[in-house]
């Protein structure tokens, strides 16, 4: 099997790197002729009896994990899935998530990595946009039973198959019998194939699927594992959703497995639960978003749990304040690593040997020597060190375009392939970045990205809503919360009724506005557009007055 420099976008609807860049990254050794399934097989051959995964009920060796993945791959193939198919994968943290991912990787079936918090509004949208052949779910996801939703997906034609980890009745299919198939040895996936689709928070209601290919995503994982010091002694705790790019591949679950370490699976990230797991399993590494990091800090100051095994806490998803950053080492007893990353590609890490001022006050520098970063002004001109501009990037693991969105890609990517992130950053003379905010109409609620337009469109569809606009409001714990300003029709609905309506629409709970205000009109700009800037300023002043 040989990686080809030929762009496959004509057959998979996703822009690939131009041939010259493919050759550059192959020659540099960044990209290898290997799929994720083959990489796992390499780890299993190296340490077959070592424990790869554990949760409260189960411990799997590398050999057992590989065998179960291969059996499931064979069963899924018998069920009708084949190379090039797309499925929506909607599972909670668990060993089943890892097994299903690698089984799909082996078949060359591309999972859309939905989050546990997603509900019918999002899942149906993913299925239809990606023309998914199947939905793969569980009998229970964070207290939610997705099986009625899965039946509706089938009835509406959003997908053709619905496969469930757990109990299932027709027309749903249980996945357990598929593990009885004879293990599939061959790997259908090629290094240049799309391995999976990550999800972009975006700024609109249209799903934006991020095509991550085996060769570049594996480089992302391996280079991250090297920078973060992951090895066979690493014990990695999954508190954040495993489908997240951060938890999955930065270096995350897959980085741990490829380094022959052990993954401790948790469906919860609260301090009480995780502290007990850290003590019991001697966890060495984990990753959090800033709000959870602050909860851990507060809990440990009052509890003094045994966290003596913990060596590294990664914090990313949004900016961690320097005051909280300064507390990590004295309170948790471990090193802090700040992370700035995006599912589209670029990852920046503070390095393990960085001086404290770098770790406390920056979000790190790019992972790869071939990451090309430009910080530009509104006219696209590069700004100087310390000046704020938009972060743009291209490199060996940053995508060249979203799946099936050519018009959006023309705006989101420059003609020479730089991704316009929408992040406002400053950069020092050594290439370290500091996040200053966002250009795009997107809200970052504790690391979860919310497209304002998606929520606005649902609100405007309510018969008692004339118009709606959604903005971020500052929050000391989450960084940002959401506030919806609504111009009602009479009789005016209550804020509670509107929240209930959004839940009934199947909107993920984290996207439902924290606050809804009914107003007679919106402030306007000089050209008659809604002035979200004025609304954000109004909220800021109000919150400051209350403080």
UniProtKB/Swiss-Prot annotation:
InterPro entries linked: AMP-bd_C (IPR025110), AMP-bd_C_sf (IPR045851), AMP-binding_CS (IPR020845), AMP-dep_synth/lig_dom (IPR000873), ATP-dep_AMP-bd_enzyme (IPR050237)
Keyword Signal part of the UniProt annotation: no
Highest taxon listed in the record's lineage: Bacteria
Effect of disrupting the coding gene: Insertion mutant does not produce Dha and pyochelin.
This enzyme's EC code(s): 6.2.1.61
Gene Ontology terms: biological process: antibiotic biosynthetic process
Induction notes from the record: Part of the pchDCBA operon. Is probably positively controlled by PchR. Repressed by iron.
Recorded catalytic activity of this chain's protein: salicylate + holo-[ACP] + ATP = salicyl-[ACP] + AMP + diphosphate
CDD domains named among the record's database cross-references: 23DHB-AMP_lg (cd05920)
Pathway(s) of this molecule: Siderophore biosynthesis; Antifungal biosynthesis
Keywords carried by this UniProt record: Antibiotic biosynthesis, Ligase
Pfam families tied to this protein: AMP-binding (PF00501), AMP-binding_C (PF13193)
Enzyme class name: ligase
Keyword Ligase part of the UniProt annotation: yes
A molecular function GO annotation: acid-thiol ligase activity
Family: Belongs to the ATP-dependent AMP-binding enzyme family.
Protein's job: Involved in the biosynthesis of the siderophore pyochelin. Specifically adenylates salicylate and loads it onto the holo form of PchE via a thioester linkage to the phosphopanthetheine moiety. Is also involved in the synthesis of the antifungal antibiotic dihydroaeruginoic acid (Dha or hydroxyphenyl-thiazolinyl-carboxylate), a precursor of pyochelin.
Protein name, entry field: Pyochelin synthase PchD
Encoding gene per record: pchD
């Amino acid at each position: 099997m040989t990686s080809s420099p030929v762009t496959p976008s004509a057959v998979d609807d996703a822009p690939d790197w131009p041939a010259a860049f493919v050759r550059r990254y192959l020659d540099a050794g960044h990209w290898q002729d290997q799929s994720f399934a083959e990489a796992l097989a390499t780890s299993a051959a190296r340490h077959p009896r070592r424990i790869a995964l554990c949760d409260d009920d189960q411990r799997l060796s590398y050999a057992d994990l590989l065998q179960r993945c291969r059996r499931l791959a064979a069963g899924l193939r018998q069920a009708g899935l084949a190379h090039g198919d797309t499925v929506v994968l909607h599972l909670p943290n668990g060993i089943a998530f890892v097994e299903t991912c690698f089984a799909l990787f082996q078949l060359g079936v591309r999972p859309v990595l939905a989050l546990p918090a997603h509900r019918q509004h999002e899942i149906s949208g993913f299925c239809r946009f990606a023309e998914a052949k199947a939905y793969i779910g569980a009998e229970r996801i964070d207290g939610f039973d997705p099986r009625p939703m899965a039946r509706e997906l089938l009835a509406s034609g959003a997908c053709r198959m619905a496969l469930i980890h757990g109990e299932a009745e027709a027309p749903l299919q249980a996945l357990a019998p598929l593990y009885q198939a004879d293990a599939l040895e061959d790997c259908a996936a090629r290094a240049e194939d799309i391995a999976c689709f990550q999800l972009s928070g975006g700024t609109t209601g249209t799903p934006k699927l991020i095509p991550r290919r085996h060769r570049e995503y594996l480089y992302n994982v391996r280079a991250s594992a090297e920078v973060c010091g992951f090895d066979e002694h690493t014990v990695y705790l999954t508190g954040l959703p495993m489908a997240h790019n951060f938890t999955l591949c930065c270096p995350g679950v897959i980085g741990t497995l490829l380094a022959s370490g052990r993954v401790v699976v948790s469906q919860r990230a609260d301090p009480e639960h995780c502290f007990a797991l850290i003590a019991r399993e001697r966890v060495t590494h984990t990753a959090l978003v800033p709000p959870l990091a602050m909860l851990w800090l507060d809990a440990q100051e009052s509890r003094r749990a045994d966290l003596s095994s913990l060596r590294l806490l990664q914090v990313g998803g949004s900016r961690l304040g320097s005051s909280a950053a300064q507390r990590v080492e004295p309170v948790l007893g471990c090193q802090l690593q700040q992370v700035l990353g995006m599912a589209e590609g670029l990852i920046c890490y503070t390095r393990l040997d960085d001086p404290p001022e770098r770790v406390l006050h920056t979000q790190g520098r790019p992972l790869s020597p071939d990451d090309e970063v430009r910080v530009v002004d509104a006219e696209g001109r590069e700004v100087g060190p310390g000046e704020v501009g938009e972060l743009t990037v291209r490199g060996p693991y940053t995508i060249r375009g979203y799946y099936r969105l050519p018009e959006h890609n023309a705006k989101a990517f420059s003609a020479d392939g730089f991704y316009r992130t929408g992040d406002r950053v400053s950069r020092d003379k050594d290439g370290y970045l500091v996040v200053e905010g966002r250009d795009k109409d997107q809200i970052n609620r504790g690391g979860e990205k919310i497209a304002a337009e998606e929520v606005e469109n649902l609100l405007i569809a309510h018969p008692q809503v004339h118009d709606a606009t959604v903005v971020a409001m500052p929050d000391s714990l989450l960084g940002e919360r959401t506030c919806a300003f609504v111009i009602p029709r009479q009789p005016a609905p209550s804020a509670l009724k509107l929240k209930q309506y959004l839940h009934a629409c199947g909107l993920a709970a984290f996207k439902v506005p924290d606050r809804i205000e009914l107003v007679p009109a919106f402030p306007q700009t000089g050209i008659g557009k809604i002035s979200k800037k004025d609304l954000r300023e109004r909220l800021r002043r109000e919150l400051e007055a209350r403080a």
